Amino acid sequence: ELPQSAAGRTIMTTEPKFVPSNAAKIQIDDFSANVRLVDCVGYVIPNAKGYEDENGPRMVKTPWYDEEIPFIEAAEVGTEKVIKDHSTIGIVVTTDGSIGELNRVDYVEAENRVVTELKEIGKPFIVLLNSTHPMLPETERLAEKMQEEYDVPVLPISVENMTERDIYNILGEALYEFPVLEVNVDMPEWIACLSANHWLKKIYVDKIRESVI
């Protein structure tokens, strides 16, 4: 079952969706990765609709509790569990307020909560700034401001109009957020045999160090 999405203020997602059920192998530039997306509500924002009904808080079933719980609580619990237990990297999708009826200010608190939580648990992530006009100077300025504030890549993009190439760029940018833990270098045997102080070997080592730091 695919996640649902629509224009307007009404929340469409009711529970996390894993797409596809089994990870798909995707080639990105010079390396491949097994990818499975987990779509979740995130934190409910002011002026959104769908988390209450005529009887008060909307009650929903979740995989984590036997009984129904309020939608807002379910959204928060689900989001936290997805971030902590079911993901290795995060893509935070927020907006400049141009995509619908909600303003930029409505998203900021929830956006900060997600970013703070990802930083606290050390999950690598990037931010997508969804906009109907991602190329305009004011959108790029907002992305730059957010990038400076959050210290992570912030990519302005129109999610509705993005291409396959855009998706590859997003995945590539996200994967580059993983820290480099080890670099293996294959040198010709005759260079490996030289002493560590040999001038030629030192040139090789210095160039390798420059390229990875």
Protein language model annotation of sequence segments:
Residues 113-126, 131-197:
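Canonical P-loop GTPase G-domain recognition
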